[in-house]
A protein has these predicted regions:
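Beta-hairpin "wing" of winged helix-turn-helix
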Residues: 50-60, 67
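Residues within the alpha-helical elements of helix-turn-helix
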Residues: 20, 34
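Alpha-helical residues within the helix-turn-helix
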Residues: 33, 44, 50-51
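Amphipathic alpha-helical dimerization/coiled-coil segments
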Residues: 1, 19, 69-88
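Short capping segments at the starts of secondary-structure elements
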Residues: 12, 23-27
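Pre-recognition alpha-helix immediately N-terminal to the DNA-recognition helix
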Residues: 15-17
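Helix-turn-helix DNA-binding motif, specifically the short coil turn and the N-cap/start of the second
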Residues: 27, 38-41
């Protein structure tokens, strides 16, 4: 799963989306408003984040709401910290 996490994090737009979601859940429309890219591009970014299990979705009426999942980021952080300890 770490490979998917790293792939998702390599894009600055996806990192910015994660920063937004760190402050709280957002609808796809609220996320899209923040960026000057096409709706299909935003949808693709959100799909990659979901595939990497960095976000989860739920329906609220006609809206899809995205929420940050911190566990994959915590796992990556732990791995990086352990890697640094081993190399020092």
């Amino acid at each position: 799963m770490m490979q998917e996490t790293l792939f998702a994090l390599c894009d600055p737009t996806r990192r910015e989306i994660l920063k937004m979601l760190k402050k709280g859940s957002k609808t796809a429309g609220e996320i899209a408003e923040r960026f000057d890219i096409s709706p299909p591009a935003i949808s693709r970014h959100l799909s990659i984040l979901k595939d990497a299990e960095l976000v989860e979705t739920r329906r609220e009426g006609k809206f899809v709401v995205y929420e940050l999942i911190c566990e994959p980021l915590d796992e990556l952080d732990d791995w990086l910290r352990n890697m640094m300890k081993e190399n020092l």
